[in-house]
């Protein structure tokens, strides 16, 4: 569950074509700030963790599903690994209007790296 000061989260789990895995998330705060963290996993299993603000997720456009406006295309940056990618929802209409509403679904990755992955978002 989110705290009273958090409005939602955006969670990315990406499998890059070179065998690397990138997991990153940001927690959106009610004051407009964010907290982010990520993990970079090499094909050999070695792990590098990144703290707040090293992983950057910026929405590029909003898609309307019902009465919700959802960011279904993102720019992700991880400067230490020269990552500058666009993440695009394969099915932008995948909003789940349940007791805790959320969006989740597969994504395509293009830019400095390519691949596929998964995105989950809440608080929209």
Predicted regions and their residues:
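Structured soluble/peripheral alpha/beta segments that form catalytic or ligand/cofactor-binding pockets
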Residues: 1-124
């Amino acid at each position: 569950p989110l705290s009273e000061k958090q409005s939602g989260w955006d969670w990315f789990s990406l499998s890059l074509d070179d065998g690397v895995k990138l997991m990153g998330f940001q927690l959106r705060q009610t004051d407009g700030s964010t907290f982010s963290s990520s993990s970079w996993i090499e094909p050999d299993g070695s792990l590098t963790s990144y703290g707040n603000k090293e992983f950057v997720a910026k929405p590029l456009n909003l898609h309307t599903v019902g009465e919700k406006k959802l960011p279904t295309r993102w720019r992700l940056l991880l400067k230490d690994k020269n990552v500058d990618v666009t993440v695009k929802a394969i099915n932008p209409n995948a909003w789940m209007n349940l007791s805790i509403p959320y969006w989740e679904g597969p994504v395509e990755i293009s830019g400095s790296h390519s691949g596929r992955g998964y995105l989950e978002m809440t608080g929209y």
